[in-house]
Design a protein with these regions (language model features):
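PP2C/PPM-type serine/threonine phosphatase catalytic domain
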Residues: 1-278
Length: 278
């Protein structure tokens, strides 16, 4: 079920902390879950952030995890928010060029002298993960240690879950990867499988609490696909688990489903599965 209306929402944990509180809301097709941390474990701030845009034809999402203040999160969210009209135009491009264009646009912004000057003036820095889905493809740009997964039964059977790898010494902000002689980040594009693809983005607070259940991707896959319940309820249950595991760090989840009716790629020795998209 896709919305036809444009959906725009952005959030920074400094404005709505959700300490000891799980908040799960839906914006268009996209579910956003927030949890600020367990007060009894010492949680007293939320430095995560998120931005979600969708219009039925595509989704553009950003998840952030700030360090040493939320100022860098506010800066990145407001900077991307100001680019909405430009990005909306880019998202109307043909599938052959759209991901290259959106990546070039984001890198141009992050490497601009004006943005880098603003970064020098903020306290702290942030991890930042951007994901874009259009048609049967997903693109991501990752700075730092947030993760994005694509959950699908075919991929699950082969043990494939994450799109990116966590990088623990990359940030945007006062310490800024885009100030290096060679900026460090990862990006990529994946074809989505035929049928239901569940896209899940998380900050490290989901992974690094208590027994660290969700550092094992299979556990996150299992709990995000439990009992045929609504996506919102799965997200809520995972953040409740973080709370009961005395998670001190804030935990944020962005998730949505994409039902792909296009044929996906198979190897040449499985001719019965190979079909050409008309």
């Amino acid at each position: 079920m896709h919305t036809t209306n444009n959906t725009q929402y952005s959030w920074a944990g400094s404005r709505e902390m959700c300490l000891d509180e799980v908040s799960v809301k839906q914006y268009g097709d996209i579910v956003l879950g927030k949890y600020g941390g367990n007060i009894s474990a010492g949680a007293k701030k939320n430095e995560d952030g998120a931005l979600v845009w969708s219009n039925g034809d595509w989704e553009f999402t950003v998840i952030l995890d700030g360090h040493n203040s939320a100022e860098s999160v506010d800066l990145v969210v407001s900077t991307i928010q100001a680019e909405y009209e430009n990005i909306k135009v880019i998202m109307n491009e043909l599938i052959e060029t759209v991901f290259r264009s959106v990546e070039n646009h984001m890198l141009t912004i992050f490497q601009s002298s004006s943005f880098k000057e603003k970064c020098k003036r903020v306290k702290g820095e942030t991890a930042c993960l951007i994901c874009v889905r259009k048609e049967n493809y997903i693109w991501w740009l990752s700075i730092g240690d947030c993760l994005v997964y694509v959950f699908h039964d075919e991929l699950h059977k082969l043990g494939q879950y994450t799109l990116n790898q966590r990088q623990f010494y990359e940030w945007i902000g006062n310490v800024n990867t885009f100030d290096l002689p060679v900026p460090c980040y990862s990006s990529g594009i994946r074809e989505l499988r035929t049928g239901k693809n569940r896209i899940v983005m998380v900050t490290d607070g989901v992974l690094e609490c208590g027994e660290r259940r969700y550092e094992t991707p299979l556990n996150l896959y299992s709990d995000m696909n439990k009992n045929n319940i609504e996506l919102k309820e799965n997200v809520h249950n995972i953040l409740e688990h973080v709370h009961h595991q005395l998670g001190r760090d804030s935990a944020t989840i962005i998730s949505w489903d994409y039902e792909n009716d296009a044929y996906a790629t198979y190897p040449s020795d499985q001719p019965e599965k190979i079909k050409v998209k008309k």
